[in-house]
């Protein structure tokens, strides 16, 4: 009896080809996962160091001046901590939150590889929130650092303090730079996430 199927046409191969093609769209490849994993590890390291450096920033120095009451030369010991500034405290809290989120998202992205595509949108939204959090805290901390470096006599009557507490200002500025690098890493993560969403569609 003559076969009803056309020669050379294999139904199973055709279905398998379509399934394989569909699987390529849904399942993320290791080449697309690796940059995201590396960037999250970088963000973990940078935010951790930033929070520790900023939180531990303090300096004790001896200030010499003339007593206004006695008109005599006097010396006092002054200790300044980063936690005296609300902006610096906000910086530490923000970096700690981003650090914990980075750890959790890294674990989820490595454990649930099969469901990584379905989690791309939540990850992208959360990553964008981390970008906003980092940039806002970095901006607040940088503004206070500028005042500490240059003073603000015209509006608030604040004197500059970095000429007396140079070590404190150096550590604060280093923490801000590291946190800015972490925010750049998250910007790249958001771009990768949007690209993966577009590719999956």
Swiss-Prot record:
Alphabetical UniProt keywords: Cell membrane, Membrane, Transmembrane, Transmembrane helix
Disulfide bonds: none
Record-level GO cellular component terms: plasma membrane
The keyword Cytoplasm belongs to this UniProt entry's keyword annotation: no
Bilayer disposition of the protein: Multi-pass membrane protein
The keyword Protein transport is assigned to this record: no
InterPro entries: CASP/CASPL, CASP_dom, CASPL
Intracellular or extracellular location(s): Cell membrane
Superkingdom classification of source: Eukaryota
Predominant location category: membrane
Transmembrane segments: 37-57, 88-108, 128-148, 174-194
Extracellular face of the membrane: 58-87, 149-173
Cytoplasmic side: 1-36, 109-127, 195-201
Family: Belongs to the Casparian strip membrane proteins (CASP) family.
Subunit structure: Homodimer and heterodimers.
Protein name: CASP-like protein 1E1
Organism: Musa acuminata (Banana)
């Amino acid at each position: 009896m003559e076969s009803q199927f056309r020669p050379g046409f294999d139904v199973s191969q055709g279905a398998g080809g379509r399934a394989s093609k569909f699987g390529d769209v849904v399942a993320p490849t290791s080449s697309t996962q690796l940059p995201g994993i590396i960037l999250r590890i970088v963000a973990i390291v940078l935010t951790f160091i930033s929070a520790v450096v900023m939180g531990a920033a303090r300096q004790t120095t001896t200030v010499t001046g003339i007593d206004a009451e006695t008109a005599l030369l006097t010396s006092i010991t002054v200790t300044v901590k980063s936690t005296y500034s609300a902006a610096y405290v906000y910086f530490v809290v923000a970096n700690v939150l981003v650090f914990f989120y980075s750890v959790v998202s890294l674990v989820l992205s490595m454990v649930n590889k099969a469901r990584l595509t379905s989690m791309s949108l939540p990850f992208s939204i959360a990553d964008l929130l981390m970008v906003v959090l980092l940039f806002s805290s970095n901006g607040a901390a940088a503004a206070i650092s500028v005042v500490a470096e240059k003073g603000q006599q015209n509006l608030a009557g604040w004197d500059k303090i970095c000429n007396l507490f140079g070590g404190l200002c150096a550590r604060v500025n280093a923490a801000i730079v590291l946190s800015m690098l972490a925010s750049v890493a998250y910007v790249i993560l958001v771009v990768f996430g949007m690209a993966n969403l577009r590719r999956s569609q």
